[in-house]
Amino acid sequence: MKLRNVSKNNLNKEDTKLSIEQFGGNVEWFNITKTLSESLPYIQQFSGETFIIKYGGAAMTDKKLAESFAHDVVLLKQLGINPIVVHGGGNKINEFLEKINKKSTFINGLRITDAETLEIVEMVLCGLVNKNITQLINNAGGNAIGLCGKDANLIEAKKICYTYKENQSNNVEKILDMGFVGEPHDINTDLLFFMEESDFIPVIAPVCSGENNLTYNVNADLVAGALANAMAAAKLIILTNVSGVTDSNGNLISELSVSHAENLIDNGTAHTGMIPKLQTCVKVVKEGYGSAHIIDGRIPHVLLLELFTIHGTGTMVVNSGV
C-alpha cells in the first residue's frame, strides 16, 4: 500500500485555521483545540500502521522526559497505531565502562566492540535499560514486552567491517576490524506481527546473534531502519539530542529530500553520530514507502508534536521535496 503524503508542507493549513478571537481570547483553549484539530488527518491516515521508534539520548536519561515518552507510546497504541521501540543506551554503557577504566573508540558513530566491551553492552542494554523502558511503558498503561535481537531469532546479524586507505599516495585498502559489531541481516517479522495483533508493544535492545552463535553489538539506528523496511512501517522516528538535521550554518532543515540528505553526508555537514541516522533514514525512504523523522528528544511529548501537528518539530526525510 502506498501512503498518501501528508507532509508539513503538503497539508492545507486553511482547513484547520482558527483564531484566538473565536475562543474569547482564551489562549489555552485556542492552543488545545488547534492541536487536537490538526491531529485528525494524521490519526486517520496512520491508524493500523506500524511506527518504528528509535529511543535514545536525553529522552532516556531524564526522568520526566522518559515518562512523557512512555505516555506518548501508549497513546499511539490507543489511537490504533502499532509502535515498536528500539533503544540505544550509549551513556549507560559508557558509565559502566568507566568503572573498569575502559575507553571506547568510535568509527562513523559505531563503537568498536571487543569481547569485554560486548559483555558490558549486553548486560546494560538487555538487562538494565531494556527492562527500565518496558516498565515505564507498562506503568503508563501499555502492554510492553522487552526483547533483544537474540530472542526467538528476532534479528540475525552479520559482522560489519570498514575499509580504509592507510596512505593516500596509493590505492591499497585495509580492513578495519570493528570487533563484535554487526549489522541487521534478517528479521523475524512473524513474531512482531503476532505481538502487534496481540496488543503488545515490543521494546527491542540491539544485541543480536550471528553466524557460529556469535553475539553482535548492532547500532540501534541500523536496527530501527531494518525493522522499518521489514515491517513496511509507515514511519521511522529517531530521537536525538539535537533539534534535527541542520545545514552548514546550523539552521534546522524541516523537510529533507533523499538527495539532499546524501549530500550532507558526502560533504561532511553531517558527522559522527548523525551519519548512521541519516544513512538509515535514506535507506528506509528509498526502499520503503513511508517517511523518516529525526527529532529532538529533549522536548516533552515530542513524538506527538512531530507526528500530529502541521509544523512538527524536527526533520522529516522524504523521497521527494526540497
UniProtKB/Swiss-Prot annotation:
<keyword id="KW-0808">Transferase</keyword>
<dbReference type="GO" id="GO:0006526">
    <property type="term" value="P:L-arginine biosynthetic process"/>
</dbReference>
<keyword id="KW-0055">Arginine biosynthesis</keyword>
<comment type="pathway">
    <text>Amino-acid biosynthesis; L-arginine biosynthesis; N(2)-acetyl-L-ornithine from L-glutamate: step 2/4.</text>
</comment>
<dbReference type="Pfam" id="PF00696">
    <property type="entry name" value="AA_kinase"/>
</dbReference>
<dbReference type="GO" id="GO:0003991">
    <property type="term" value="F:acetylglutamate kinase activity"/>
</dbReference>
<keyword id="KW-0418">Kinase</keyword>
<dbReference type="InterPro" id="IPR036393">
    <property type="entry name" value="AceGlu_kinase-like_sf"/>
</dbReference>
<feature type="site" description="Transition state stabilizer">
    <location>
        <position position="277"/>
    </location>
</feature>
<dbReference type="GO" id="GO:0005524">
    <property type="term" value="F:ATP binding"/>
</dbReference>
<keyword id="KW-0963">Cytoplasm</keyword>
<feature type="binding site">
    <location>
        <position position="111"/>
    </location>
    <ligand>
        <name>substrate</name>
    </ligand>
</feature>
<feature type="site" description="Transition state stabilizer">
    <location>
        <position position="54"/>
    </location>
</feature>
<comment type="similarity">
    <text>Belongs to the acetylglutamate kinase family. ArgB subfamily.</text>
</comment>
<protein>
    <recommendedName>
        <fullName>Acetylglutamate kinase</fullName>
        <ecNumber>2.7.2.8</ecNumber>
    </recommendedName>
</protein>
<comment type="function">
    <text>Catalyzes the ATP-dependent phosphorylation of N-acetyl-L-glutamate.</text>
</comment>
<keyword id="KW-0547">Nucleotide-binding</keyword>
<keyword id="KW-0067">ATP-binding</keyword>
<dbReference type="GO" id="GO:0005737">
    <property type="term" value="C:cytoplasm"/>
</dbReference>
<dbReference type="GO" id="GO:0042450">
    <property type="term" value="P:arginine biosynthetic process via ornithine"/>
</dbReference>
<dbReference type="InterPro" id="IPR041727">
    <property type="entry name" value="NAGK-C"/>
</dbReference>
<feature type="binding site">
    <location>
        <begin position="89"/>
        <end position="90"/>
    </location>
    <ligand>
        <name>substrate</name>
    </ligand>
</feature>
<feature type="binding site">
    <location>
        <position position="217"/>
    </location>
    <ligand>
        <name>substrate</name>
    </ligand>
</feature>
<dbReference type="InterPro" id="IPR001048">
    <property type="entry name" value="Asp/Glu/Uridylate_kinase"/>
</dbReference>
<dbReference type="InterPro" id="IPR004662">
    <property type="entry name" value="AcgluKinase_fam"/>
</dbReference>
<keyword id="KW-0028">Amino-acid biosynthesis</keyword>
<dbReference type="InterPro" id="IPR037528">
    <property type="entry name" value="ArgB"/>
</dbReference>
